[in-house]
């Protein structure tokens, strides 16, 4: 985790396909919101997916994708330039347009406007692959789950949500997903601040991470409030002038 405490907090969650990243993010958000409510503070949280930063496929590639013959897990399929630019703009407090990715048609479908937030959580298999992105993250998490469980979860999800045939899912997993995980995803575990074993089954780790993030958020807010109080006091004394203020 970064030593410098400042908002927004940008949390990255990486790990293999269907290892429980989304479930873990949802639990972290739930815990953060619950803790914030108890302390009487409001916390704005944005949840993003690396899917939004897939590059646009050609017509031929979309056909291959529908047949389970396209490798989505290779780094070349991610627009890391756009991802790094978007995250930097969010850190700078700017409103951004996030592409909307349709998992069924393997295509982009417009954008969604995202306002500035105090906590930004983004998840994706190759999230820790690009150095520029890693440098922007306040906290980097890597979720581990055994290969058999990940394949079982992937089968259930892709059959239920994307209407994919089981044999197509298994073929794509064997030919592309598993080899790409070993070559590109697993090695990025070394960049993680925290490794979460057993995936979404690890409630203890999720709760501890949420508590740590909540405490970090509290310290930032308190520090910011104290700085503002000092600044206001100096302004009253006439020994401090806020940036860009005009002389009276």
UniProtKB/Swiss-Prot annotation:
Region annotation Disordered: where it falls in the sequence: 224-248
Statement: the UniProt record of this protein carries the keyword Translocase: no
InterPro entries with a match to the protein in the record: P-loop_NTPase, PRK/URK, Uridine_kinase-like
Signal peptide (from-to): none
Cited SUPFAM superfamilies: P-loop containing nucleoside triphosphate hydrolases (SSF52540)
The keyword Zinc belongs to this UniProt entry's keyword annotation: no
Pathway(s) of this molecule: Pyrimidine metabolism; CTP biosynthesis via salvage pathway; CTP from cytidine: step 1/3; Pyrimidine metabolism; UMP biosynthesis via salvage pathway; UMP from uridine: step 1/1
Its EC number(s): 2.7.1.48
Entry's Gene Ontology cellular component terms: cytoplasm
Keyword list, A-Z: ATP-binding, Kinase, Nucleotide-binding, Transferase
Name of the featured protein: Probable uridine-cytidine kinase
EC class: transferase
Binding positions for ATP per the UniProt entry: 15-23, 201
Catalytic activity: uridine + ATP = UMP + ADP + H(+); cytidine + ATP = CMP + ADP + H(+)
Superkingdom of origin organism: Eukaryota
Source organism: Caenorhabditis elegans
GO annotation, biological process: CTP salvage; UMP salvage
Amino acids binding substrate: 73, 101, 154, 164, 172
Taxonomic lineage from the root: Eukaryota, Metazoa, Ecdysozoa, Nematoda, Chromadorea
């Amino acid at each position: 985790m970064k030593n410098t405490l400042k908002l927004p907090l940008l949390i990255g969650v990486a790990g293999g396909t269907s290892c429980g990243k989304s479930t873990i993010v949802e639990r972290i958000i739930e815990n953060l919101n619950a803790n914030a409510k108890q302390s009487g503070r409001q916390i704005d949280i944005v949840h993003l997916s690396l899917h939004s930063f897939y590059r646009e496929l050609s017509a031929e590639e979309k056909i291959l994708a529908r047949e389970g013959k396209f490798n989505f897990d290779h780094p070349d399929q991610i627009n890391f330039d756009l991802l790094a630019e978007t995250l930097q703009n969010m850190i700078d407090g700017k409103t951004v347009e996030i592409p909307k990715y349709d998992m069924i048609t393997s295509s982009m479908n417009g954008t969604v406007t995202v306002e500035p937030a105090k906590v930004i959580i983004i998840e994706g298999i190759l999230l820790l692959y690009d150095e520029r992105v890693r440098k922007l993250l306040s906290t980097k998490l890597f979720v581990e789950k055994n290969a058999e469980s990940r394949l079982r979860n992937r089968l259930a999800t892709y059959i239920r949500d994307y209407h994919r045939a089981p044999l197509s899912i298994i073929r794509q997993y064997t030919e592309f997903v598993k080899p790409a995980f070993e070559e590109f995803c697993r090695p990025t575990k070394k960049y993680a601040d925290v490794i979460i074993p057993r995936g979404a089954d690890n409630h203890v780790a999720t709760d501890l991470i949420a508590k740590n993030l909540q405490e970090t958020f509290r310290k930032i807010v308190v520090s910011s409030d104290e700085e503002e109080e000092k600044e206001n006091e100096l302004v009253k004394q006439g020994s401090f002038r806020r940036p860009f203020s005009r002389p009276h």
